[in-house]
Each structure stands twice: as C-alpha cells, then as structure tokens.
C-alpha cells in the first residue's frame, strides 16, 4: 500500500495553477507557466509587463471568465466553477496610463442665459466650452477665468443641438426652426452662411471624422422632418439628402469607417455610405422609438488628434500640419477600433438596448434588458469596454461593451437621469438628473464617488472635458456650473 501523502503536500500541490496570458483579441502572450493560487494583480502585472517587454510598464487589469481579479486569483476563482486541472486563461487589459480625479466642488456658477441651458459641450482639447439655450443663443465661456466669453446671436428659436468639429475650430448649432449655424470660438462670430433646408427642428449634428477629412469640411444633421442632410460647410450648401426614414430622425453618428448611422422614431436604425448616400442596411428590432445611440469609437472620433494622456494644465489648440493631425487621429481611432469594425449600441422607448455590429450584420449581437423606463442616453466608455445607459427609471446601468452582458446598476438619483459623461480614463462617470443634482460614480467599484448638489432645478446637460480637468452642467435654472476636483 502506498504511503499516505502528507496533507500539507496535498494542500501545497493545490496551491499552484498553470496559467496562460491572452490579450482581449485572444492573442497568446508567452507560454503557460505556473503561479501560486494566491497571486495578486500587482504580481501578475510584473510578470505580464516583463513578457510584453514594454519600455514603460503598462497599468493592466486581469480577468478570468469575465470576472476581474481584484484581490487574488484564488478569490476570483472561488466565485466560479472553474476546472483548475486545465491551463487557465488570464485575459490582460491595458488601462489608461493617466488618471482623472473626481470633481468635488463647483468653482463657478455662470449666469448669462435667460432661458434653460439645453446643451453643454467642451471642445476636443478642453480649451473651450460652449452652451446652447432656449434663449436662442449659443455662448462660449472662457475656461481660464471661468467667465462668459462670447454670446452668439443668429438663431431665431431654441438651440437644441451643438457639436464641435473634431479639430476644435468650429462649432455647429441647430435650432427648433431647422437652421444650422457655424461659429468660430476664438471670435464668437458666425462662419460662412446659415445652412437652411430642414423643414422641422434639428435633432442631431455629427462631423465627418478628422482622420477622413482633416479640414473638417463636412457635417451631417438629423431632423424631426425625417431626413438626414450632409453639408459642405466651406461652400455653405447641402451636398446630399438621405431619405428613407418614415418618422423623425432622433440621432445621428458619423462613424470612422465611412458609414453614417441614423436612428428614428420609426423604430429603425439606418446605415448609410457617407460618400454617396447609399443605404447599406436597416437595423430592426426595437419595439418603439429609438431615442439614442452610441459608437464604440465615439470618444476617439470626438477628440480626433488630441490624446488626453498628454493634456497640459492649460488646454491649447492642436498643433501640427493637417497631415500630422490626420495621422494622429487615425492611429487613435484604430487603437480603439481594434480588430473588428466599430460597434453600435441603441436605446429605446421600449426600455431596451441593442448592441450591433452594423458594418457586418443587420441582426443585433444582443438585446440588453433591465431598465424599467425609457432610455435617455447611452455611451461607450472612451476605451469602449463598458456601455453606460441613463434612464427615466432613475438608474444608470453598466454593460459589457463587447458582449452586452449586464454588469451593474448605479442607484442614488431620486428622479430621471437625463445625461451622462465619461472621464477620459474610463474610470469615472458623471450624471445629471431631474432631481437637480450631479453625481460622480466610480465605475470599477460600482458606487457613488461624489454627490454634487448646487443647481436649483433639473439638470439637462452635462459634459466632462477631454483633458479631465472640469465637468460642466446646465439646466432649467439657466445657470452653467463648472465643477473641479
């Protein structure tokens, strides 16, 4: 009879596992090696960075079967039924090398608008802040002094939508009577002629990506009239009208691979080829109006050639030739786009979200359910790994950006959540609500980081500057507030 193996030895044998590092795309890194089961993320980071042979070590997160290794590998495995006899795949994920700190206080309350603030938007480098209001004006604010800079008059009705060109040199604004105006943030003057043609109000504006068009010449608009128009801002004329939706177009995205996406109250999303306006496919599935959508590449498209990790204390305009800016924007886009084409997520009045790979398939990848009321806004994190959705059910929900799997609900608002914005490092999220507060959430911990009261009424609009320095908010109390850490 074989000698009984001492218990400690058995215990010791169990304490080691064979693991294999892989990147998110399934690419293997090195060969399998054995580790103690109580290995921590810090130790994994040292080993993984040694294998990657990077000059500067990257901050990494590690996952086993979609669960993040937070304290130790063993702790993560306890919550899962994993066969430990086999080689265990550990997925490593580079994290942002810079860190955005949560904003904690209101540093200015800027008065000037005489009606509700409907939209706020920082320029791609965070140098300028613009707002659109029910008082028919667009305003630019000086961020170094946190004072009003220019008041832009020209619209004859509420300004419903504003959008920065990705080079930060022009702002487009669309109003309730269907007109689009362009503004120069350095002078506050109107640029070129008024773009008129839509018969009803403007619901969305989206610029052609910088890597496709470094002159930032073309902008697309969507309208309650059911059409999408592409405008040549240099010539001041409409290049193309895209028709096919049978009801109001609610939002619009100009993607990085030459496609335009439009969502509508006719329950569909249409995918168009931007250069000739040909309809590629219609995405169907929602049972009610499609209110909102987002692309996995949105943040890279919005910021163009600006790299948040290299932000200076005082944001500047982008320097470099058009060709250099184009190349920088393209490499940033390709990094986020990764192996597959860009993904799209849509949110509807039917309380659901759908995740699509619209360049490839007209069937959704997955349907995301859980909200108890209509969805106001949906956004991919800048690194495209997480989707956040804000709803009239007072919650924000987090979903996996690749699979659409439900991750968590962020609860704390006591009324509808209207708008959300991500910090550039994908670690924090800010939300504005009908309950008059803003809240900053720690996404990894899935909990409230900061409660920001201050507005006297509903908060309609919120944005986080791409350099991470400031959050801006506006709403029914006509006041624009700037929040800093």
Swiss-Prot record:
Major place of residence: nucleus
Modified residues (N-acetylalanine): 2
Alphabetized UniProt keyword annotations: Acetylation, Notch signaling pathway, Nucleus, Phosphoprotein, Repeat, WD repeat
Keyword Endoplasmic reticulum: no
Alphabetized Pfam families for the sequence: NLE, WD40
GO cellular component: nucleolus; nucleoplasm
Residues spanning the signal sequence: none
Residues in WD repeats: 112-151, 154-193, 197-241, 244-282, 325-366, 370-409, 412-451, 454-485
Disulphide-bridged cysteine pairs: none
Region (Ubiquitin-like (UBL) domain): 14-96
In-chain residues carrying the UniProt-annotated modification Phosphoserine: 79
Keyword Repressor on entry: no
Family recorded in the similarity comment: Belongs to the NLE1/RSA4 family.
Function: Plays a role in regulating Notch activity. Plays a role in regulating the expression of CDKN1A and several members of the Wnt pathway, probably via its effects on Notch activity. Required during embryogenesis for inner mass cell survival.
Subunit structure: Associates with the pre-60S ribosomal particle. Interacts (via WD repeats) with uL18. Interacts (via UBL domain) with MDN1 (via VWFA/MIDAS domain).
Protein name: Notchless protein homolog 1
């Amino acid at each position: 009879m074989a000698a009984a193996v001492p218990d400690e030895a058995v215990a010791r044998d169990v304490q080691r596992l064979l693991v294999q590092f892989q990147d998110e795309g399934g690419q293997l890194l090195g060969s399998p090696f054995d580790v103690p089961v109580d290995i921590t993320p810090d130790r994994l980071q040292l080993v993984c960075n040694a294998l990657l042979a990077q000059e500067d070590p990257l901050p990494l997160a590690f996952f086993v079967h979609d669960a993040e290794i937070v304290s130790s590998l063993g702790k993560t495995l306890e919550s899962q039924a994993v066969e430990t006899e086999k080689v265990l795949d550990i997925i490593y994920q580079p994290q942002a090398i810079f860190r955005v700190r949560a904003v904690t206080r209101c540093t200015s309350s800027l008065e000037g608008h005489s009606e509700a603030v409907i939209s706020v938007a920082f320029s791609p480098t965070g140098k300028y802040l613009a707002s659109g209001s029910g008082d028919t004006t667009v305003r630019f604010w000086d961020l170094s002094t946190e004072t009003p800079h220019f008041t832009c008059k020209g619209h004859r009705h509420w300004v419903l939508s504003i959008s920065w060109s990705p080079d930060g040199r022009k702002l487009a604004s669309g109003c309730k009577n269907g007109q689009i105006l362009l503004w120069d943030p350095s002078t506050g003057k109107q640029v070129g002629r008024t773009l008129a043609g839509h018969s009803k109000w403007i619901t969305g504006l989206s610029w052609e990506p910088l890597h496709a068009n470094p002159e930032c010449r073309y902008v697309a608009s969507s309208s309650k009239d059911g059409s999408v128009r592409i405008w040549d801002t240099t010539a001041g004329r409409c290049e193309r009208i895209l028709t096919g939706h049978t009801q109001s177009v609610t939002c619009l995205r100009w993607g990085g691979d030459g496609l335009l996406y439009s969502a509508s109250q006719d329950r569909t999303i249409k995918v168009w080829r931007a250069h000739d306006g040909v309809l590629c496919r219609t995405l169907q599935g929602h049972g009610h109006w499609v209110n909102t959508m987002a692309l996995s590449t949105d943040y890279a498209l919005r910021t163009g050639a600006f790299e948040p990790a290299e932000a200076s204390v005082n944001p500047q305009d982008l320097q470099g030739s058009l060709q250099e800016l184009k190349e920088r924007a393209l490499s940033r886009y390709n990094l986020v786009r990764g192996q597959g084409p860009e993904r799209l997520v849509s949110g509807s009045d039917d309380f659901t979200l759908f995740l699509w790979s619209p360049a490839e398939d007209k069937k959704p990848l997955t349907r995301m359910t859980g909200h108890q009321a209509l969805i106001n806004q949906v956004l991919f994190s800048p690194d495209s790994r997480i989707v956040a959705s804000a709803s009239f059910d007072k919650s924000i929900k987090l979903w996996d950006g690749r699979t659409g799997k439900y991750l968590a609900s962020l609860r704390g608002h006591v009324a509808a959540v209207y708008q959300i914005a991500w910090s550039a490092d994908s670690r924090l999220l800010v939300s504005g609500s009908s309950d008059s507060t803003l809240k900053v959430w720690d996404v990894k911990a899935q909990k409230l980081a900061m409660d920001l009261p201050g507005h006297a009424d509903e908060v309609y609009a919120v944005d986080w500057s791409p350099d991470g320095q400031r959050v801006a908010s506006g709403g029914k109390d006509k006041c624009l507030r700037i929040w800093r850490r």
